[in-house]
Amino acid sequence: KVLLLEFPHGEIPFAAERMTDWLLQRGILPMIAHPERNKGVMRAPSRLKPFIEQGCLLQVTASSVAGGFGPAARAIAHDLLKQGLVTILATDAHNIDYRPPVLTDGLQQAALLIGDAQAEALVRQTPWQIARGHFQ
């Protein structure tokens, strides 16, 4: 099973790696939500390394890839895409009026960085595979 895990926006909590390890030991695979927008990651992108080494998944926000959350989030999102570390490209649509579910711009930018097939997999095939694992 996959668990979408969102850290506080200001920082990665102390000992968060212990929590993700605890989840992994119980067969729950953490997927870290929009790490590119976390202030702690923005200050030190290497903060993600322990989670990546553990095997945690990463969900990056499409608007970040397109620059909608500023240049720092965009740069980190692009770097994660180029390194092949992004599992899913998503919308982070909490409200249809305030933050609608639009993937288009981010998907186009991702395709320029990693190619059409890989970008498409981040929004179609991979999410589908994860969902199938939960709802079989």
Where in this protein do the model-derived segments appear?
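Conserved, mostly hydrophobic/aromatic
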Residues: H34, D92, P127
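Active-site environment of divalent metal-dependent phosphoester hydrolases
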Residues: R37-V41, V65-G68, H94-R99
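Charged helix-capping and loop-helix junction motifs
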Residues: E17-T20, R43-K49, P71-L81, L103-G106
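Short acidic/histidine-rich active-site segments
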Residues: L85-P101
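Mid-to-C-terminal alpha-helical segments outside catalytic/metal-binding sites
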Residues: L103-Q136
